[in-house]
């Protein structure tokens, strides 16, 4: 018959803990455990424990070694990333400077083109003004000549009578004969 009176049922029907050391056989359990440890120490328990500790040690060392390798790889990748970042910053600065230079050059080209267009427009305007002035002057001359001719004809018509008309014709005929004789001498 096995006596396990570690837990007992009190008469009231509740749950409780037996604190009587003699009734729970704690001394017997301690003696059995002590003998097992003493006998197992030299045989297999020590080997198993040593093997377990050695395996655990190797696992920990392997984990540490793997962690160190990953740390070295991560450090190398970080350094490479920093190098690429620095190169990217340098390239970005070059692009920014080139962009600003290009923008200034294009701005200056636009200013120069606008100045050239302005100069050409000014020249064209001045040329058009001179042309229009010449045309206006020519129109005024033609009008003045026409008016002068009309007045002269009007004056001649009012003053010219038959006798004056005959004298004018004779005078011009004489001029033409004189011119004809002069040209015959040169030939």
Curated annotation (Swiss-Prot):
Q: What is this protein called?
A: ATP synthase subunit b, chloroplastic
Task: Please give the start and end residues of each transmembrane region.
Answer: 29-49
Q: Which organism is it from?
A: Angiopteris evecta (Mule's foot fern)
Primary place of residence?
Answer: plastid
Where in or outside the cell it occurs: the entry states: Plastid, Chloroplast thylakoid membrane
- Presence of the UniProt keyword Cytoplasm in the record: no
| Coiled coil location | none
Q: What else is known?
A: In plastids the F-type ATPase is also known as CF(1)CF(0).
* Superkingdom in the source lineage: Eukaryota
Task performed by this protein: F(1)F(0) ATP synthase produces ATP from ADP in the presence of a proton or sodium gradient. F-type ATPases consist of two structural domains, F(1) containing the extramembraneous catalytic core and F(0) containing the membrane proton channel, linked together by a central stalk and a peripheral stalk. During catalysis, ATP synthesis in the catalytic domain of F(1) is coupled via a rotary mechanism of the central stalk subunits to proton translocation. Component of the F(0) channel, it forms part of the peripheral stalk, linking F(1) to F(0).
- Family assignment from sequence similarity: Belongs to the ATPase B chain family.
Cite the NCBIfam families for this sequence: PRK07352.1
This protein's GO cellular component annotations are: chloroplast thylakoid membrane; proton-transporting ATP synthase complex
Q: Which UniProt keywords apply?
A: ATP synthesis, CF(0), Chloroplast, Hydrogen ion transport, Ion transport, Membrane, Plastid, Thylakoid, Transmembrane, Transmembrane helix, Transport
Query: What is an example of a GO molecular function annotated in this UniProt entry?
Result: proton-transporting ATP synthase activity, rotational mechanism
Q: Does the keyword Plastid apply?
A: yes
What topology does the record note for this protein and the membrane? Single-pass membrane protein
The entry describes its oligomerization and partners as: F-type ATPases have 2 components, F(1) - the catalytic core - and F(0) - the membrane proton channel. F(1) has five subunits: alpha(3), beta(3), gamma(1), delta(1), epsilon(1). F(0) has four main subunits: a(1), b(1), b'(1) and c(10-14). The alpha and beta chains form an alternating ring which encloses part of the gamma chain. F(1) is attached to F(0) by a central stalk formed by the gamma and epsilon chains, while a peripheral stalk is formed by the delta, b and b' chains.
